[in-house]
Amino acid sequence: MLKLRSFIFALGYNISSALIGLIAVIIWPIFPYSWRWRIVTCWNRFVMFWLRVCCGIRFEIIGSKHADKFPCVVMAKHQSTWETMFLQYYFGPVSTILKKELFRIPFFGWGLASLRPIAIDRSNPIQALKEIKKQGIERLKQGNNLMIFPEGTRTPVGEVGNYARSGADIAISAGVPIIAVAHNAGECWPHKQFIKYPGTIRVVISEPIETEGKDRKQLTEDVKNWIEGEIAKMPPARKDGVKLVAIEKK
């Protein structure tokens, strides 16, 4: 039954992804960014709805009042595809740091490109860091939030990746606060797995973390400790009660 429900979800997901990609291309030269963001992120909301209908995956938010701080740098745990879609509209308008290869994905990549992301070339890490900081500060000055997954890539549930300091560096340079986001989406929507598991994803949003006079190394460590600490306290997301224990990468 889980395979069938996951298949139906994937079918709707892929068809709707193609549709919103075409819409994004059509409206790109016509509508201003604020309207493009509203239209394109309707797809993100649809995915949340479709996930609930097909796979029985819901979510609850703790600390939602802290999401009203604009502009800010959002630093979130990266376990799944789920958070990339949820956070995109929840903290919007938001510019996301992502690998440029995503733009090559037909339809989906087109929709992404219309939302002012910051695309980086991971084959040239030094130049990528410079571009992240330069464009990140520009987006914040334009009034956008900036979303960063400090671990750089998805980490399987139960693992703790290395937290990069670029998010803290940008926030300090731009003089904006950091909002940390902890969640356990990977338990219901595991990375690189087709099957989706019914349950309730917990999303915990921190109070604004002020950056004035802070050191980026310590600030990054504080964010990491907060995120991983909140995840450790969460009850299992899946209805079957499966919960993994975090293992930090060395």
Residue spans for each PLM region:
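A short, well-structured juxtamembrane/interface segment
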Residues: 47-71, 246
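Non-catalytic C-terminal accessory region of glycerolipid acyltransferases
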Residues: 3-4, 129-250
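Catalytic core of membrane glycerolipid acyltransferases/transacylases, capturing the structured
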Residues: 21-41, 52-54, 68-125
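Thr-Gly-centered strand-to-loop micro-motif
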Residues: 62, 98-99, 120-122, 150, ...
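A hydrophobic membrane-anchoring feature enriched in long, contiguous, low-charge segments
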Residues: 4-30
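Generic preference for hydrophobic
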Residues: 61, 74, 96-97, 203-205
